[in-house]
Amino acid sequence: IGVRLVGSEMCIRDRYIIWISEIILQQTRVVQGYDYFLRFMNRFPDVDALAAASEDEVLKCWQGLGYYSRARNLHAAARQIVEWGGFPERYENIRQLKGVGDYTAAAIASFAFGLPHAVVDGNVYRVLSRYYGIEEPIDTGHGKKYFAAMAQELLPEGKEAADYNQAVMDFGAMQCVPKSPKCEDCPLVDGCAAFRDRRIQELPVKSRALTVTERYLHYMYIEVGGEVAVFRRESNDIWKGLYEPFLIETPAACAPENLLNDEKVPSFIRSDKAVMTYLCGGVRHQLTHRTLICDFYKVELADRPDDFGRSVCWVKKEELSNYAFPRLVVMLFEKFGLW
């Protein structure tokens, strides 16, 4: 985004745009992030607007992009920038912003300020490892340092550095893609070690496979007189800062007829006064390291209970859309017309 979405003719005032776009692109492809980028920029057109917003407002605008720690870090960093009196212009100072690592700091330094810092993202890892036939794993500390040093050595001097950075990233995103790269019309194919040695699919190398765990969620949409009980996730877990219906998590799958026996189910849900409806089950939602398997219930009560054991917000059904919910919850609400 930034240079990649709004064009390469950037002036110095666009450092804010570049920063926001690079944070969005940390875990999101350009084609997926474009509309979110425009929405975010429309809602928070400058760093002062972002810093002045509440965390709930920022998370609501970010809703659907995932990896919500990015939004929380953006918000915190915006307040850092305001406190400092302006956007930092040196790599070392940019690196001190909340949520900004080596890659993002290099991207901002290069694209916003024309500083000679190599930008190394997944596309760059892939291009360099394939072209030079490098077997160094890209997901280890040593490997990351190896590729960063190599990219820095290859970086041209002067004003061409930013264009070179952008060119390699774009080449990886459009030509040397992860699966089925376009080798037949690649301008670099004659010098490509991976093509020559038929190792396209083997490179880049990763040292460890991704471990995915399953989690079993049972959401209860509790409604009393047109108001719905929602809860803000506060722990350092998935979706921190977002809202959700009442949740019971079990270590394994649990059939509806057995769920009421779980000690985490409040007594008011077990009572004869509660009207509980099983809406759907086994809904799978994939996160990077987790597979969420969700059952969804609706519970209708005559009076507000007072023994949730945690802080609750009672929200009018028609106002639920003002709150930031995980995509999984939004899909369930929409499927059953619950907001």
Where does each model-flagged region fall?
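Contiguous mid-protein beta-loop-alpha structural module that forms a pocket-lining wall or clamp
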Residues: 99-213
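A short secondary-structure junction motif
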Residues: 22-35, 67-69
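Intrinsically disordered, low-complexity, charged terminal extensions of DNA damage-control enzymes
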Residues: 8, 173-339
